[in-house]
């Protein structure tokens, strides 16, 4: 049902892709530029009656009711991510791992022993996780497996976008063309998605195969904020990740199926400059010096910088592209509205 993670309509757990691959003896990896508890990475690893059940305690996105371990549930998404023991887990959302565990003990066959009163992160460390928090620490990791899984947490919330936020207007014709610039919050120690993907591939390679989920999460998040520059930068990160996978396949010669798609459509429109549209418009100067207008037209709430937000998902069909063994069985388009 809508808003749930890894459960059926009755709220009963159904196997996740990560669990299925792990049961077959494959190594598994889960990479996102979002909070690692966000919907796409969570669907790889967890079962939740509500997608917002990130933490076992605290004051934000706390699991409730039957989800809680003290009530016999599977626990928060953060706890379940640790219990899956994916070989590689990389993303944001460290603030939810800093929350306190309420119920100790063992909760599945992972072998983890939980200590109440300690944070989720400290419990992960106690159970053998290698925790990294920046690009240098990630690059230094030499191996990852179920005994020594890697947990990379690179921001308290979603990872910062590559390009600084652009502010739309109600009438693009009144706005001087802007140039997208680097986001100062995205530092040299913030790992790019392509680099995270390459490192995950390096650590996951083994004779039994692997399953790696990689998400460039912030094209969607920039779309919600009518942030044209943020959107462009994060689509660029997706392109880097795809290129990293293709390069790895070419260099290793491994028979590897690559599938690229999205969890739902969320699109902006490129219009002519000085266009008078019903949405929020940002005029940008392109690399060749021309003007490109980007329009966001699913909400009119973006009046100023403080009110950014409110743009909604769109109803387009989704492209599904694939290469490698089995690619012929992957459909070209799917309807995935929400």
Show the residue positions of the predicted features.
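A post-motif C-terminal structural segment
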Residues: 37-338
């Amino acid at each position: 049902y809508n808003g749930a993670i890894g459960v059926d309509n009755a709220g009963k757990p159904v196997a996740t892709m990560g669990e299925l691959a792990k049961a077959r003896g494959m190594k598994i990896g889960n990479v996102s530029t979002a909070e690692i508890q966000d919907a796409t990475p969570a669907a790889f690893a967890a079962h939740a009656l509500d997608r917002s059940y990130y933490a076992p305690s605290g004051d934000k996105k706390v699991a409730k009711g039957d989800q809680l371990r003290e009530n016999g549930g599977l626990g928060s998404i953060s706890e379940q991510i640790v219990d899956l023991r994916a070989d590689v887990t990389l993303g944001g959302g460290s603030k939810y791992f800093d929350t306190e565990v309420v119920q100790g003990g063992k909760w599945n066959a992972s072998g983890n022993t939980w200590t109440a009163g300690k944070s989720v992160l400290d419990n992960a460390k106690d159970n053998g996780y290698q925790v990294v928090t920046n690009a240098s620490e990630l690059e230094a990791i030499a191996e990852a497996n179920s005994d020594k899984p890697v947990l990379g947490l690179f921001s308290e919330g979603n990872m910062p976008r590559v390009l600084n936020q652009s502010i739309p207007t109600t009438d693009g014709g009144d706005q001087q063309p802007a140039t997208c610039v680097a986001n100062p919050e995205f530092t040299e120690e913030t790992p790019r998605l392509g680099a995270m993907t390459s490192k995950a591939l390096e650590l996951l390679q083994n004779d039994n195969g692997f399953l790696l989920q990689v998400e460039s999460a912030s094209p969607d998040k920039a779309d919600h904020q009518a942030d044209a520059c943020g959107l462009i930068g994060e689509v660029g990160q997706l392109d880097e990740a795809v290129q990293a996978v293709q390069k790895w396949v070419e260099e290793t010669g491994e028979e590897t199926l690559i599938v690229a798609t999205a969890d739902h459509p969320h699109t902006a429109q490129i219009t002519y400059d000085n266009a008078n549209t019903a949405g929020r418009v940002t005029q940008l100067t392109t690399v060749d010096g021309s003007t490109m207008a980007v329009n966001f037209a699913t909400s009119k709430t973006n009046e100023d910088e403080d009110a950014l937000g409110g743009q909604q998902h769109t109803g387009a069909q989704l492209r599904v592209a694939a290469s490698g063994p089995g690619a012929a069985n992957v459909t070209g388009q799917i309807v995935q509205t929400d």
